[in-house]
Protein backbone atom coordinates (compact mmCIF):
# COMPACT_ATOMS: atom_id res chain seq x y z
CA UNK A 1 0.00 0.00 0.00
CA UNK A 2 2.73 2.59 0.76
CA UNK A 3 4.25 1.91 -2.67
CA UNK A 4 0.86 2.44 -4.31
CA UNK A 5 0.35 5.74 -2.46
CA UNK A 6 3.76 6.89 -3.73
CA UNK A 7 2.72 6.21 -7.31
CA UNK A 8 4.98 3.22 -7.93
CA UNK A 9 4.40 1.02 -10.95
CA UNK A 10 3.28 -2.54 -10.20
CA UNK A 11 4.38 -5.22 -12.66
CA UNK A 12 2.16 -8.31 -12.44
CA UNK A 13 2.54 -11.75 -14.00
CA UNK A 14 -0.28 -14.17 -14.74
CA UNK A 15 1.70 -17.02 -13.19
CA UNK A 16 5.11 -17.41 -11.62
CA UNK A 17 7.86 -18.46 -14.01
CA UNK A 18 11.49 -18.01 -12.88
CA UNK A 19 13.02 -17.27 -16.29
CA UNK A 20 10.02 -15.16 -17.28
CA UNK A 21 10.24 -13.14 -14.07
CA UNK A 22 13.91 -12.38 -14.66
CA UNK A 23 13.07 -11.17 -18.18
CA UNK A 24 10.25 -9.00 -16.78
CA UNK A 25 12.56 -7.50 -14.16
CA UNK A 26 15.16 -6.62 -16.79
CA UNK A 27 12.65 -5.24 -19.31
CA UNK A 28 10.84 -3.08 -16.74
CA UNK A 29 13.81 -1.98 -14.61
CA UNK A 30 12.12 -3.47 -11.56
CA UNK A 31 13.52 -2.08 -8.30
CA UNK A 32 11.63 -4.06 -5.64
CA UNK A 33 10.50 -7.70 -5.60
CA UNK A 34 8.36 -9.40 -2.96
CA UNK A 35 8.69 -13.18 -3.10
CA UNK A 36 7.97 -16.29 -1.06
CA UNK A 37 10.83 -18.73 -0.32
CA UNK A 38 9.77 -21.34 -2.89
CA UNK A 39 10.00 -18.67 -5.61
CA UNK A 40 13.42 -17.48 -4.44
CA UNK A 41 14.73 -21.05 -4.45
CA UNK A 42 13.61 -21.48 -8.07
CA UNK A 43 15.19 -18.16 -9.05
CA UNK A 44 18.48 -19.17 -7.46
CA UNK A 45 18.58 -22.16 -9.81
CA UNK A 46 18.98 -19.67 -12.70
CA UNK A 47 22.47 -18.12 -13.03
CA UNK A 48 20.90 -14.99 -14.54
CA UNK A 49 19.40 -14.10 -11.16
CA UNK A 50 22.19 -11.81 -9.95
CA UNK A 51 23.10 -8.13 -9.72
CA UNK A 52 24.98 -8.16 -13.03
CA UNK A 53 21.90 -9.20 -15.00
CA UNK A 54 19.34 -7.21 -12.95
CA UNK A 55 21.20 -4.03 -11.87
CA UNK A 56 17.95 -2.12 -11.26
CA UNK A 57 16.88 -4.41 -8.42
CA UNK A 58 17.32 -2.65 -5.06
CA UNK A 59 15.34 -4.93 -2.76
CA UNK A 60 14.38 -8.60 -2.58
CA UNK A 61 11.88 -9.12 0.23
CA UNK A 62 11.01 -12.65 1.32
CA UNK A 63 7.70 -13.17 3.11
CA UNK A 64 5.25 -15.90 4.03
CA UNK A 65 7.63 -18.53 5.40
CA UNK A 66 11.22 -18.84 6.66
CA UNK A 67 13.99 -18.93 4.05
CA UNK A 68 16.70 -21.50 4.81
CA UNK A 69 20.09 -20.06 5.75
CA UNK A 70 21.73 -21.85 2.81
CA UNK A 71 19.47 -19.94 0.42
CA UNK A 72 19.87 -16.64 2.29
CA UNK A 73 23.64 -16.86 1.94
CA UNK A 74 23.41 -17.61 -1.78
CA UNK A 75 20.97 -14.74 -2.31
CA UNK A 76 23.18 -12.27 -0.43
CA UNK A 77 26.19 -13.45 -2.45
CA UNK A 78 24.38 -12.81 -5.73
CA UNK A 79 22.46 -9.71 -4.64
CA UNK A 80 24.59 -7.88 -2.05
CA UNK A 81 22.82 -5.31 0.12
CA UNK A 82 19.40 -6.12 -1.31
CA UNK A 83 18.00 -8.84 0.94
CA UNK A 84 15.17 -8.19 3.40
CA UNK A 85 13.10 -10.71 5.35
CA UNK A 86 9.72 -10.07 6.96
CA UNK A 87 8.33 -12.33 9.66
CA UNK A 88 4.91 -11.62 11.02
CA UNK A 89 1.27 -12.41 11.55
CA UNK A 90 -1.61 -10.51 9.97
CA UNK A 91 -3.07 -10.29 13.47
CA UNK A 92 -0.42 -7.74 14.41
CA UNK A 93 3.11 -8.97 15.07
CA UNK A 94 6.23 -8.56 12.93
CA UNK A 95 10.01 -8.36 12.72
CA UNK A 96 12.26 -7.21 9.87
CA UNK A 97 15.74 -8.33 8.89
CA UNK A 98 17.12 -5.57 6.67
CA UNK A 99 20.04 -5.41 4.28
CA UNK A 100 22.25 -3.58 6.78
CA UNK A 101 22.02 -6.27 9.48
CA UNK A 102 25.37 -7.87 10.34
CA UNK A 103 26.12 -11.06 8.40
CA UNK A 104 26.27 -12.89 11.74
CA UNK A 105 22.53 -12.23 12.12
CA UNK A 106 21.58 -13.70 8.72
CA UNK A 107 20.09 -16.77 10.39
CA UNK A 108 17.59 -14.56 12.22
CA UNK A 109 14.40 -12.85 11.03
CA UNK A 110 15.49 -9.51 12.42
CA UNK A 111 14.08 -7.23 15.10
CA UNK A 112 10.68 -5.63 15.72
CA UNK A 113 10.14 -2.24 14.03
CA UNK A 114 9.59 0.86 16.19
CA UNK A 115 6.51 0.73 18.47
CA UNK A 116 6.40 -3.08 18.35
CA UNK A 117 7.32 -5.31 21.28
CA UNK A 118 8.36 -8.95 21.32
CA UNK A 119 8.81 -11.55 24.07
CA UNK A 120 9.65 -15.24 24.30
CA UNK A 121 7.56 -17.04 26.92
CA UNK A 122 7.09 -20.50 28.40
CA UNK A 123 3.81 -22.41 28.61
CA UNK A 124 2.82 -20.37 31.68
CA UNK A 125 3.42 -17.02 29.96
CA UNK A 126 6.67 -16.28 31.80
CA UNK A 127 9.66 -14.78 29.98
CA UNK A 128 12.42 -17.28 29.26
CA UNK A 129 16.14 -16.41 29.46
CA UNK A 130 17.99 -14.98 26.46
CA UNK A 131 18.71 -17.59 23.75
CA UNK A 132 16.25 -20.11 25.21
CA UNK A 133 13.37 -21.44 23.10
CA UNK A 134 9.77 -20.49 23.85
CA UNK A 135 6.63 -19.18 22.18
CA UNK A 136 6.86 -15.87 20.33
CA UNK A 137 4.38 -13.28 21.60
CA UNK A 138 4.11 -9.64 20.62
CA UNK A 139 2.07 -6.48 20.47
CA UNK A 140 2.07 -3.27 18.51
CA UNK A 141 0.00 -0.44 17.06
CA UNK A 142 -1.88 -2.64 14.56
CA UNK A 143 -2.76 -5.47 16.93
CA UNK A 144 -6.16 -6.83 15.93
CA UNK A 145 -9.11 -6.37 18.31
CA UNK A 146 -10.07 -10.00 17.74
CA UNK A 147 -11.36 -12.62 15.32
CA UNK A 148 -14.74 -11.81 13.80
CA UNK A 149 -17.51 -13.44 15.85
CA UNK A 150 -15.00 -15.85 17.43
CA UNK A 151 -14.44 -14.73 21.03
CA UNK A 152 -13.12 -18.20 21.84
CA UNK A 153 -10.27 -17.93 19.32
CA UNK A 154 -9.62 -14.33 20.35
CA UNK A 155 -9.24 -15.32 24.01
CA UNK A 156 -6.81 -18.06 23.01
CA UNK A 157 -4.70 -15.80 20.78
CA UNK A 158 -4.62 -12.57 22.84
CA UNK A 159 -3.78 -12.89 26.52
CA UNK A 160 -3.10 -9.88 28.71
CA UNK A 161 -2.73 -7.75 25.60
CA UNK A 162 -0.11 -9.98 23.97
CA UNK A 163 -0.67 -11.89 20.72
CA UNK A 164 0.44 -15.52 20.98
CA UNK A 165 1.83 -16.61 17.61
CA UNK A 166 1.97 -20.38 18.00
CA UNK A 167 5.56 -20.13 16.71
CA UNK A 168 8.63 -21.17 18.67
CA UNK A 169 11.71 -18.98 18.66
CA UNK A 170 14.50 -17.43 20.67
CA UNK A 171 15.92 -13.93 21.11
CA UNK A 172 19.67 -13.36 21.16
CA UNK A 173 21.46 -10.85 23.35
CA UNK A 174 20.96 -8.13 20.71
CA UNK A 175 17.21 -8.69 20.40
CA UNK A 176 17.30 -10.53 17.06
CA UNK A 177 14.62 -13.18 16.66
CA UNK A 178 15.50 -16.69 15.50
CA UNK A 179 12.62 -18.90 14.39
CA UNK A 180 12.68 -22.49 15.61
CA UNK A 181 9.39 -23.96 14.38
CA UNK A 182 5.63 -24.05 14.70
CA UNK A 183 4.60 -25.57 18.04
CA UNK A 184 2.26 -27.97 16.23
CA UNK A 185 5.05 -29.17 13.90
CA UNK A 186 7.39 -30.18 16.71
CA UNK A 187 8.39 -33.87 16.71
CA UNK A 188 8.60 -35.80 19.98
CA UNK A 189 11.09 -38.65 19.64
CA UNK A 190 11.89 -40.75 22.68
CA UNK A 191 10.34 -38.05 24.87
CA UNK A 192 12.65 -35.36 23.45
CA UNK A 193 11.49 -32.28 21.51
CA UNK A 194 12.85 -32.30 17.95
CA UNK A 195 12.50 -29.19 15.77
CA UNK A 196 12.13 -29.95 12.02
CA UNK A 197 13.76 -26.66 11.01
CA UNK A 198 17.07 -27.64 12.68
CA UNK A 199 17.19 -30.78 10.54
CA UNK A 200 16.04 -28.97 7.40
CA UNK A 201 18.99 -26.57 7.61
CA UNK A 202 21.32 -29.59 7.45
CA UNK A 203 19.48 -31.42 4.67
CA UNK A 204 19.31 -28.40 2.37
CA UNK A 205 23.09 -28.01 2.68
CA UNK A 206 23.53 -31.26 0.73
CA UNK A 207 24.71 -30.31 -2.79
CA UNK A 208 21.98 -32.35 -4.52
CA UNK A 209 19.07 -30.98 -2.47
CA UNK A 210 17.21 -27.86 -3.58
CA UNK A 211 14.57 -27.77 -0.84
CA UNK A 212 13.36 -29.90 2.06
CA UNK A 213 10.50 -30.31 4.50
CA UNK A 214 10.85 -32.47 7.62
CA UNK A 215 7.96 -33.90 9.62
CA UNK A 216 7.36 -36.56 12.23
CA UNK A 217 6.05 -40.04 11.43
CA UNK A 218 5.14 -42.88 13.83
CA UNK A 219 7.99 -45.09 15.05
CA UNK A 220 7.47 -48.32 17.07
CA UNK A 221 10.32 -47.59 19.48
CA UNK A 222 10.63 -43.81 19.71
CA UNK A 223 7.02 -42.74 19.21
CA UNK A 224 7.99 -40.52 16.28
CA UNK A 225 11.01 -40.11 14.04
CA UNK A 226 11.96 -37.45 11.47
CA UNK A 227 11.12 -37.99 7.80
CA UNK A 228 12.53 -35.70 5.09
CA UNK A 229 10.75 -34.90 1.84
CA UNK A 230 13.20 -33.38 -0.64
CA UNK A 231 13.16 -31.58 -3.97
CA UNK A 232 16.36 -32.43 -5.81
CA UNK A 233 18.64 -30.42 -8.07
CA UNK A 234 20.11 -33.62 -9.49
CA UNK A 235 19.68 -37.38 -9.18
CA UNK A 236 21.27 -38.83 -6.07
CA UNK A 237 21.13 -41.97 -3.93
CA UNK A 238 18.63 -41.10 -1.21
CA UNK A 239 20.25 -43.46 1.27
CA UNK A 240 23.50 -41.56 0.74
CA UNK A 241 21.66 -38.32 1.54
CA UNK A 242 20.15 -39.83 4.69
CA UNK A 243 23.53 -41.08 5.94
CA UNK A 244 25.18 -37.75 5.04
CA UNK A 245 22.61 -35.87 7.13
CA UNK A 246 22.73 -38.29 10.06
CA UNK A 247 26.50 -37.92 10.29
CA UNK A 248 25.97 -34.19 10.89
CA UNK A 249 23.03 -33.98 13.28
CA UNK A 250 23.81 -33.02 16.85
CA UNK A 251 21.85 -35.76 18.60
CA UNK A 252 20.56 -39.30 18.00
CA UNK A 253 16.92 -38.26 18.14
CA UNK A 254 17.48 -35.86 15.21
CA UNK A 255 18.54 -38.67 12.88
CA UNK A 256 16.35 -38.95 9.81
CA UNK A 257 14.63 -42.29 9.31
CA UNK A 258 13.45 -41.82 5.73
CA UNK A 259 14.32 -39.52 2.82
CA UNK A 260 12.02 -39.45 -0.19
CA UNK A 261 11.55 -37.26 -3.27
CA UNK A 262 8.65 -35.00 -4.22
CA UNK A 263 8.29 -32.75 -7.26
CA UNK A 264 6.99 -29.84 -5.18
CA UNK A 265 5.65 -29.14 -1.70
CA UNK A 266 2.00 -28.39 -0.95
CA UNK A 267 1.73 -24.76 0.16
CA UNK A 268 -0.97 -22.43 1.41
CA UNK A 269 -1.86 -19.07 -0.15
CA UNK A 270 0.95 -17.41 1.81
CA UNK A 271 3.54 -19.79 0.36
CA UNK A 272 4.07 -21.76 3.56
CA UNK A 273 4.86 -25.45 3.18
CA UNK A 274 2.05 -27.60 4.58
CA UNK A 275 3.95 -30.22 6.54
CA UNK A 276 0.71 -31.79 7.79
CA UNK A 277 -0.41 -32.45 4.22
CA UNK A 278 2.97 -33.99 3.42
CA UNK A 279 2.73 -36.15 6.51
CA UNK A 280 -0.80 -37.32 5.70
CA UNK A 281 0.16 -38.13 2.10
CA UNK A 282 3.25 -40.01 3.28
CA UNK A 283 1.29 -42.10 5.79
CA UNK A 284 -1.41 -42.87 3.23
CA UNK A 285 1.13 -43.84 0.56
Language model region names:
Residues 8-28, 37-39, 194-199:
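ATP-dependent adenylate-forming carboxylate-activation enzymes
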Residues 121-122, 165, 171, 267:
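Hydrophobic alpha-helical segments, especially N-terminal targeting/anchoring helices
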Residues 66, 104-149, 157:
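Adenylate-forming AMP-binding core of the ANL superfamily, especially NRPS adenylation
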Residues 25, 33-36, 88, 140, ...:
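AMP-binding/adenylate-forming catalytic core of the ANL superfamily
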